[in-house]
Design a protein with these regions (language model features):
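C-terminal output helix
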Residues: 107-116
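Two-component/phosphorelay signaling modules centered on CheY-like receiver
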Residues: 13-31
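Short amphipathic alpha-helix used as the core "switch/output" element in two-component signaling
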Residues: 41, 63-76, 116
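Active-site beta3 strand of CheY-like receiver
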Residues: 46-52, 57
Length: 128
């Protein structure tokens, strides 16, 4: 699997650290944020290939983070929603906000690896 720059947006320290460790073991470069505004700053500055975004963030929720990333100029990262529920309504709202996929927490490491391996992730553009 190709190494990607992945942004994790998760307010739970343990969940964020576990995801970071899993992704780094798979050879990815990871940036992490605990809340929405921090995530948006990182997304603007680092231009990640993928963003794993918890829906239930304090302050700006994950849906709004996704909408703002989608509205920004530049590359369109693959957006994966992380939710504790996964009900049809959650999936519908995630799609409307601009997410490409939804994973239910706790995230199954194999499901995440499989998702990253099979989904089309846009190639990084020219960065002159």
């Amino acid at each position: 699997m190709q190494s990607r720059l992945i942004l994790i947006v998760e307010d739970n320290d343990d969940a964020r650290d576990a995801l970071r460790m899993l992704l780094e073991l798979d050879g990815h470069v990871v940036e992490a944020a605990a809340e929405g505004n921090e995530a948006l700053e990182i997304a603007r500055g680092k231009d990640p290939d993928v963003a794993l975004v918890d829906i239930g963030l304090p302050g700006i929720d994950g849906y709004e983070v996704a909408r703002r990333i989608r509205a920004a100029d530049g590359k369109r990262p693959l957006l994966i929603a992380l939710t504790g529920y996964g009900q049809p309504e959650d999936r519908r709202r995630a799609a409307e906000a601009g997410f490409d996929s939804v994973l239910v927490k706790p995230v199954d490491p194999n499901a995440l690896s499989d998702l990253l391996a099979t989904l089309e992730i846009p190639a990084r553009g020219f960065r002159g």
